[in-house]
């Protein structure tokens, strides 16, 4: 194959330039304006549950502002999912707080509710106080066991900040991911379900929380004619130009989600019954992943190879793949942080690959990818 097949490239609707041109024509090129307002309204309608949405410069910024509004500060602990990208945990450190890492369960690869409750009890026993927040992730678009996580959080009266950066459009029991916690986080990075070039959003419970989020995202400027600041703020608002890209992307969001699910269904059919290669799929009917990235596990005993060897061979054949996230409790920067592990995320990390699933991936591409993966696993 002459072309290179990428994991998930941005796919434009063709309407983005019109919204951007409108911003230039009206000179709305700042971090506010009609595109920002409209993009937030469209996201609010999409996620539902009577939530409000604030468009921001990144998903990381959204996590940071969520933590601030939950009162997370120096000396606090926040329970975080270990099997994730570092941006899920780093904002905890921004606040001078300590991430406490929880391993995954097999069904969804997300935060294990059993370990979560064990960790809460243990942290209370060791520190004399509850963790300040719980930060689960919907990894690769697969919904976590969020009902169990939220039930445990409610039992101990700990708020949930839900990282749905990879899960725009994913659902658990028909409800959109990102709407279960006190706050929810979305990402519009260039490789996500939709993009604003860079960007993210914080899903908040009400208008009051939206105003508070916007306050902190706009350098915490007080309502005076002069510039007055009584709290530390941040430059986290999304520009009107980037929001214009987002508005164009919203017109094809449903198509993008449908395409990712279609590609996954093709993989599911192609890998069925293949010994040594396991495709990650919805555990049962409660889960409806967007399949932002499709993921496979390669059993080294049954295939005679390993994920990294397969990755290198696929790269030579024009197919981009990527190892699964290295768990946070294995990262040098968090080597001394408390962690509650069961071995699941380490095993997954040592066996797994992300494979192409984006809007540019065709049925023919999937057939070629599957053919090459099978060939790599036959030596």
PLM feature spans:
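PLP-dependent aminotransferase class I/II
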Residues: 34-41, 50-51, 114-118, 126-129, ...
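Phosphate-binding glycine-rich loop
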Residues: 32-77, 91-93, 101-103, 126, ...
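Active-site phosphate-binding strand-loop segment of PLP-dependent enzymes
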Residues: 107-196, 201-203, 208
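N-terminal "arm"/small-domain region of PLP-dependent enzymes with the aminotransferase-like
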Residues: 1-30, 356
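Conserved coil-to-alpha-helix start sites within the AMP-binding
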Residues: 84-89
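Structured binding elements
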Residues: 96
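Anion (oxyanion) recognition and catalysis
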Residues: 93, 150, 154, 315
């Amino acid at each position: 194959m002459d072309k290179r097949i990428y994991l998930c490239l941005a796919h434009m609707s063709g309407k983005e330039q019109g919204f951007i041109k409108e911003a230039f024509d009206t000179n709305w090129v700042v971090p506010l304006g009609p595109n920002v307002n409209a993009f937030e309204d469209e996201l609010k309608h999409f996620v539902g549950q009577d939530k409000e949405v604030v468009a921001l410069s990144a998903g990381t910024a959204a996590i940071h502002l969520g933590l601030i509004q939950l009162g997370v500060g120096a000396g606090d602990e926040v329970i975080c999912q270990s099997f994730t990208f570092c941006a899920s945990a780093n904002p905890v450190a921004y606040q001078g707080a300590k991430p406490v890492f929880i391993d995954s369960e097999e069904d969804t690869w997300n935060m294990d509710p059993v370990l979560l409750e064990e960790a809460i009890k243990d942290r209370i026993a060791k520190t004399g106080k509850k963790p300040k927040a719980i930060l689960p992730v919907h990894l690769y678009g697969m919904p976590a066991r969020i009902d169990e996580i939220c039930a445990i959080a409610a039992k101990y009266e700990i708020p949930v900040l839900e990282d749905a950066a990879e899960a725009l459009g994913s659902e658990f029991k028909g409800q959109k991911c990102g709407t279960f916690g006190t706050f929810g986080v979305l990402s519009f990075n260039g490789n996500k379900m939709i993009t604003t070039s860079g960007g993210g959003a914080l899903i908040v419970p009400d208008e009051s929380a939206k105003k508070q989020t916007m306050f902190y995202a706009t350098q915490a400027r007080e309502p005076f004619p002069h510039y007055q600041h009584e709290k530390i703020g941040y430059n986290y608002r999304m520009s009107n130009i980037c929001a214009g890209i987002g508005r164009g992307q919203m017109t094809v969001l449903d198509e993008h989600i449908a395409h990712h699910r279609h590609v996954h269904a093709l993989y599911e059919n192609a890998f069925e019954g293949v010994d040594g290669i396991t495709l990650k799929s919805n555990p049962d009917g409660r889960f409806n992943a967007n399949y932002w990235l499709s993921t496979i596990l390669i059993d080294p005993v049954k295939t005679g190879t390993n994920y990294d060897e397969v990755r290198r061979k696929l790269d030579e054949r024009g197919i981009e793949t990527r190892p699964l996230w290295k768990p946070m409790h294995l990262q040098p920067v968090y080597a001394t942080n408390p962690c509650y592990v069961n071995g699941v995320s380490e095993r997954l990390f040592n066996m797994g690959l992300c494979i192409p699933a984006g809007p540019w991936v065709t049925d023919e591409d999937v057939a070629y990818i599957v053919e090459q993966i099978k060939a790599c696993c036959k030596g």
